[in-house]
Amino acid sequence: MSEPTSRRPAYARLLDRAVRILAVRDHSEQELRRKLSAPVMGKNGPEEIDATADDYERVIAWCHEHHYLDDERFVMRFIASRSRKGYGPARICQELNQKGISRESTEKAMRECEIDWSEMAHEQAVRKYGEPLPSNFSEKVKVQRFLLYRGYLMDDIQQIWRNFAD
């Protein structure tokens, strides 16, 4: 039988928790740090892991070393996931920034991903408003507002009507 969690060293408990968190999906380093430092629900309510800052650093280093934690991989998968859900580049960049990813890493990944954002914007507009897209001004404004909210850039949105006019 395994020993009770309260007797295990803090480092081992943190490492176990980190691996379980990263087994579900990729996380950024900042997200993992936040989740590791949050209290855990135990049998008797919330439990704090009495770990030192060094324990946290060792766990993060171990996760990097064993390729459980990789911000570059996280960014690429996050971009793919959010774009499949219909979000545009501006919204995705903002969400990555909130997750602690640097602007440089985000911009590099956005350049490397092979997503045609104007085509994605067109697909979202057609899904919401149907084919053919509205051509009168007031309806175009509604489509533009919707796509801006979803995180598409104005150039990509305007490209929809340029291609439509051709």
From Swiss-Prot:
GO BP of this protein: regulation of DNA repair
Alphabetical keyword list: Cytoplasm
Cellular compartments annotated: Cytoplasm
Source taxon at top rank: Bacteria
GO CC aspect terms: cytoplasm
Pfam families in alphabetical order: RecX_HTH1, RecX_HTH2, RecX_HTH3
Protein's job: Modulates RecA activity.
Cited NCBIfam families: PRK00117.1-1
HAMAP family, per the entry: RecX (MF_01114)
Family of this protein: Belongs to the RecX family.
The name this protein goes by in its record: Regulatory protein RecX
Taxonomic lineage: Bacteria, Pseudomonadati, Pseudomonadota, Gammaproteobacteria, Enterobacterales
